[in-house]
Amino acid sequence: MAWHRYFTWAYEQTLRNECGYKGYQPYYNWPRWSDDPSKSPALDGSATSMSGNGALGCSNQTFYGIPTNAAPQIKIPKGNGGGCVTSGPFKDWSVNLGPVFSDSNCVPPNPISNQTDPNVGLGYNPRCLKRDISSWTSSQWTNDEQVVDLLNSADIKTFWYNMQGGDPAFANNFMGVHTAGHFTIGGDPGSDFFTSPGEYS
């Protein structure tokens, strides 16, 4: 969690100091749009959004899983996207890093794909930004009830488990708010924990 806070701060500093941005980091109310994130101003594909969903793609895959043995039962149904982002300011965005650990069979493998290589996923691998916005994920794990439970956690341990998906991880098919954020956006690199910073939303 500390890493995410630092990353968000560094991102905001870069916007201000290198790009001339005068405002503050916008706040996104996850529960407000949990029924359909693609209708939020942040993801509606308009010129002021962070672009929209990907084109319909990857028809040979009917669901995505969380790429870890800790969550074999969580199967995320394919949404209405999966292909390249086609609208908004980042429709021509290029993703170059990864994949490292993706469950999508629609992502071209990285030139360094041997899982025993310490540089796995670090080879130059240019491709389009892909998204498969999942209201199935957001409606279950970023809704009002989940966020209130998280904020009302009695201690840091409970907060951590509510954020990350339980103890043990993903017990009872519980994804947690943090993991759900990744898989609400989905696609590539959004659903690859190791390269997800390349998904700017």
Where are these regions (language model features)?
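C-terminal accessory segments of proteins
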Residues: 1-201
